[in-house]
Regions:
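Transmembrane beta-strand segments of outer-membrane beta-barrel domains in Gram-negative
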Residues: 26-28, 44-71, 75-77, 164-295, ...
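Gram-negative/organellar outer-membrane beta-barrel architecture
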Residues: 81-91, 95-233, 238, 334, ...
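C-terminal hydrophobic structural anchor segments
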Residues: 348-382
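Short loop/turn motifs that connect adjacent beta-strands in outer-membrane beta-barrel proteins
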Residues: 78-87, 115-121, 147-152, 198-199, ...
Length: 421
């Protein structure tokens, strides 16, 4: 009953406000339904050729805005199908929900523009959130393209006041060994990618993670054994490569995605200790059956400590990937360790022909080592069903409502905007 009540309240909130809280890490703006209609609200971020097939697709599809107009005679603000060099701004209140935050009240905003007529859409997305668990988050995410798409500038700034529990090291850790922590956190990531050929980009950047005022309420545990600190700084350079052939970054129907990041943290740049890591993110999207709107999505995410000894909060951890989407079925931070190996599959299918409702079933598996130099431990599964509600039929953006299950009785509701991967 509690789950049903939470879900009902959240869906009502999504329909009456702009659900941008979960979208903040997707690096792309989406159509919003302002509480008060605003001029020039952004309708989509995906440029679709104005062909007969595209027009027919639009005519046959229904999204949340169409339903609001049909049932409540609510007409969203005038929108446009393309983004020009003139920036488009949207600032709206929203609500969000995750296992680690519970309910959150959010003020979200985004800006979208093109540097040139043929350039990809550049975006700046931000939000300020206050959560039921007394957390404060302020992220600013930017994805800027040059006029000729030769360069891509990617920024990730975050300021958090973040009470959160840890459960020990390795994927053998016990959910009942919860250790409540509290800390403040600043992240500054700046990366520049240059076009190499086709869909391939490569480059580098500067990365810093700064944790301070770290406290915990646990007894003698893995955190104490690993080494408690009141602060930690990881500062260094990164080398990056990106290959992206997806037909739609928000809701891919075909294509693939591969990203590699090598990170080297150096003492002379202020790091608490020298260490390096490697992240390999690979995804594949397959129409199944071919020619349908159903998709089999596959994902592999490996986060590996190559050498050195990262501070406890800098170790790979569940849902601390770039978009906080690994490990549905578990709370953020449930598993932590020097090595993380993760895989997930999700089958996405249409329920109604008009595209308003769809469904998914997902299955994931993750394995962690404990401290550096130890072996990978047990494989922990996560699985569950999900519902998709079409928020924007042009960009194919969905409201994603999933219920995940994991080991040791772990379970919970997961709500996002835009597909998980």
């Amino acid at each position: 009953m509690k789950v049903f009540l939470r879900l009902s309240i959240f869906i009502i909130g999504l329909l009456l406000t702009a659900p941008l809280f979960a979208q903040q890490n997707k690096d792309v703006p989406i159509k919003v339904i302002p509480v008060k209609p605003k001029k020039d609200a952004l309708k989509d971020t995906i440029h679709i050729a104005d062909t007969l097939a595209a027009r027919k697709m639009r005519e046959n599809q229904i999204d949340v805005a169409d339903m609001l107009e049909a049932f409540f005679n609510y007409k969203p603000a005038t929108t446009v199908d393309t983004v020009t060099s003139k920036p488009t701004f949207t600032i709206v209140p929203a609500i969000g929900y995750t296992l680690v935050t519970k309910f959150a009240v959010v003020l979200s905003g985004n800006m979208a523009f093109r540097a040139g007529p043929k350039s990809r859409i550049s975006t700046i997305i931000t939000s300020i959130a206050f959560t039921q668990n007394k957390q404060f988050t302020f992220p600013v995410l930017s994805n800027i393209w040059s006029k000729d798409n030769k360069y891509n500038f990617i920024g990730d700034f975050r300021l958090y006041k973040y009470p959160q529990s840890t459960f020990g090291l390795g994927s053998n850790s016990n959910i009942h060994h919860e250790d409540p922590m509290d800390y403040s956190y600043v992240r500054i990531y700046e990366t520049v990618l240059r076009h190499v050929t086709g869909n391939l980009y490569a480059g580098g950047g500067y990365i810093i993670d700064d944790h301070w005022n770290i406290t915990d309420k646990g007894r003698y545990n893995d955190y104490a054994v690993y080494g408690k600190n009141s602060f930690s700084i990881a500062s260094g350079f990164s080398l990056n490569a990106l290959l992206d052939s997806r037909d739609n970054a928000i809701n891919p129907y075909k294509g693939g995605y591969a990203s590699v990041q090598y990170r080297d943290n150096l003492n002379f740049l202020g790091s608490s200790g020298g260490w390096s890591s490697l992240i390999i993110d690979v995804r594949r999207y397959i129409n199944l059956p071919e020619g349908s709107d159903n998709v089999l999505a596959l994902w592999s995410y490996d986060w590996l400590t190559l050498n050195g000894r990262p501070a406890y909060l800098d170790l790979p951890s569940t849902q601390w990937d770039a978009f906080s989407t690994t490990g549905r079925g578990y709370i953020q931070g449930r598993f932590r360790g020097a090595q993380m190996v993760y895989a997930e599959g999700e089958y996405r299918y249409r329920i109604f022909d008009n595209g308003l409702l769809g469904g998914v079933f997902f299955l994931n598996a993750e394995s962690f080592s404990a401290a550096p130099g130890t072996k990978l431990q047990a494989i922990q599964p996560g699985y569950g069903p999900g519902l998709r509600i079409k928020l924007n039929k042009i960009s194919k953006t969905n409201i994603c409502i999933d219920y995940g299950f994991g080991s040791q009785g772990s379970k919970g509701l997961f709500i996002d905007v835009g597909e998980i991967f």
